[in-house]
Amino acid sequence: MLKRQTEGSVICPACGVLVGVNDETCYNCGRRNPGLWGYAAALRRLGNDLGFVPLVMGGTITLYALSLLLSRGSIHGMLSPDSRVLLALGASGAFPVFEMGRWWTVLTAGWLHGSFLHVLFNVMLIRQLAPAVADLYGAGRMAIIYTIAGVTGFALSSAAGLYFPNIPIIPGAVFSVGASANIFGLLGALFHYGRRTGNSHAREAGLQYAIFLGLFGLIPGTGVDNWAHAGGFAGGLAASMLLDPLTRERTDHMIGALICLSLTVVALVASFVTALPYLIQ
């Protein structure tokens, strides 16, 4: 429970020193509102990611289960939901974005998955990478990077699906789901952190993961959306450059993260509501 604290001391989320819960600024680092309106201690108990990782993992698994439930008798091999159900819930790609005008699916597609192995693999990567990025950038900036990477990844994928649908090996996606664009954004953030700070471990980890997963996507028959991967990495890299990891996380980063999550929820609701006539048939 997020119980509000009205008196006493809390740990500044930016620099870690003890400050008053009602202090306007941290005396040590200058961060404004270090008590986060009395919720700093409660949020700290959620971990460095402030509960974002469990939220993404839980939401992703829940939506996968919902897609299987709505598929009813149309579940395919490897526990793959019906593509029409995924389309209704917010799949992205050239067809949903340009033919159907469902532009908001660049926010929602990263929460949907096409098979049990697909969701399992991506959830495991999120569990491994997102806390690491949160440790380096802070929870707010990590959530912003994750969201922006999904948007840029699926935007590029959809555009490539419209203009380059038949390129050998790396065709654009007419239809696409999965958190891999967001995951590549986290890799881009790790790479930038390593380059910005001189941390060779972070730089090499981000780059090597991206290269390995990128090469895997070039294997014929895997159905991997390489354009989403490239767009996600570029988006995560660009966002992390703007959200300089050498600066302390600020309150406006947390506000930005809440806006990103709110827009994603609105997009998911919009997808579901606009698809409701189909789903109740």
Regions found by a protein language model. Give the residues of each.
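A broadly conserved sequence feature marking short terminus-proximal activation segments
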Residues: 1-5
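A detector for small-residue-rich transmembrane helices and their helix-helix packing motifs
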Residues: 8-21, 27-281
